């Protein structure tokens, strides 16, 4: 439907004002950001085209300015507004470790890291550094790319922990496929890191795999009881 043919009360801006943002669809919220259309097409049409072209809302945060401007009706100015809005959305869900977040279970880790890691297109190996009370003091990305047991060196993992005077760590990585089943390499990496941690006096509390809205804890699955 063209925006010009809508009753004023049905326009996205009016509906947001009177009914709240939750009453709007993804395309209507995008239309507000896009603001104006192009010849023969409304901002709502352009918003729908954007969603269809890039396979839905969750992919939009990965788009570059150049990607956004491939949609007719989205020039540099509009692309900058959209990119800024996507980044603000990400930052709103990013946890500030000054909040003194205490880890008591794998689900606590998932609550902190899921929004950051579930949509990453490359594998990331991340370490949460904890103090003696299991409060997160820092998050550090150790590696980006294709992970296997040979590229994750304990030296790099524990160097970060020693530098931060961390008493314990939790390691995480994501599976871009969304499947959180631990691979052989995941298990080998877990065992090696746990054994190195025991020698250094820095406890490895868990290895968590992040997928598409789900996670696997290698502690919960029993892999921390294994030895070579």
Swiss-Prot record:
Short motif (JAMM motif): ranges: 173-186
Biological process terms in GO annotation: proteolysis
Is NAD found in the keyword set?
no
Q: Which family does it belong to?
A: Belongs to the UPF0758 family.
What is the organism field in this record? Answer: Staphylococcus haemolyticus (strain JCSC1435)
- Keywords noted in UniProt: Hydrolase, Metal-binding, Metalloprotease, Protease, Zinc
Q: Which InterPro entries match?
A: MPN (IPR037518), RadC_JAB (IPR025657), RuvA_2-like (IPR010994), UPF0758 (IPR001405), UPF0758_CS (IPR020891), UPF0758_N (IPR046778)
Which Pfam family, any one, appears in the UniProt record?
UPF0758_N
Q: Write one Gene Ontology MF term.
A: metallopeptidase activity
Which residues take part in binding Zn(2+)? 173, 175, 186
Q: Where is the MPN domain?
A: 102-224
Starting at the broadest rank, the lineage of the source organism is: Bacteria, Bacillati, Bacillota, Bacilli, Bacillales
Q: Which PANTHER family match?
A: DNA REPAIR PROTEIN RADC (PTHR30471), UPF0758 PROTEIN YEES-RELATED (PTHR30471:SF3)
Provide the protein name. UPF0758 protein SH1266
> Where does the secretion signal sit in this chain?
none
Which residues span the membrane?
none
- Tree of life domain: Bacteria
């Amino acid at each position: 439907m063209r925006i010009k043919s809508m009753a004023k009360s049905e326009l996205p801006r009016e509906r947001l004002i009177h009914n709240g943002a939750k009453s709007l669809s993804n395309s209507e919220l995008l239309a507000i950001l896009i603001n104006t259309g192009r010849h023969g097409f409304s901002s709502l049409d352009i918003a729908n085209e954007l969603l269809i072209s890039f396979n839905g809302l969750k992919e939009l945060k990965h788009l570059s300015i150049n990607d956004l401007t491939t949609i007719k009706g989205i020039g540099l100015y509009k692309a900058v507004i959209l990119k800024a809005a996507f980044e603000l959305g990400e930052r709103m869900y990013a946890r500030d470790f000054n909040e003194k977040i205490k880890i008591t279970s794998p689900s606590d880790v998932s609550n902190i890291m899921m929004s950051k890691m579930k949509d990453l297109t490359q594998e990331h190996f991340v370490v949460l550094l904890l103090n003696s009370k299991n409060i997160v003091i820092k998050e550090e990305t150790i590696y980006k790319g294709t992970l296997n047991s040979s590229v994750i060196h304990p030296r790099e993992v524990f160097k970060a922990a020693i530098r931060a005077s961390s008493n314990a760590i939790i390691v995480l990585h994501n599976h871009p496929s969304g499947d959180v089943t631990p691979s052989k390499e995941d298990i080998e990496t877990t065992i090696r890191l746990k054994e190195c941690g025991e020698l250094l006096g820095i406890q490895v509390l868990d290895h968590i795999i992040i997928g598409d809205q789900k996670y696997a804890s290698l502690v919960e699955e029993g892999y921390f009881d294994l030895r070579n």
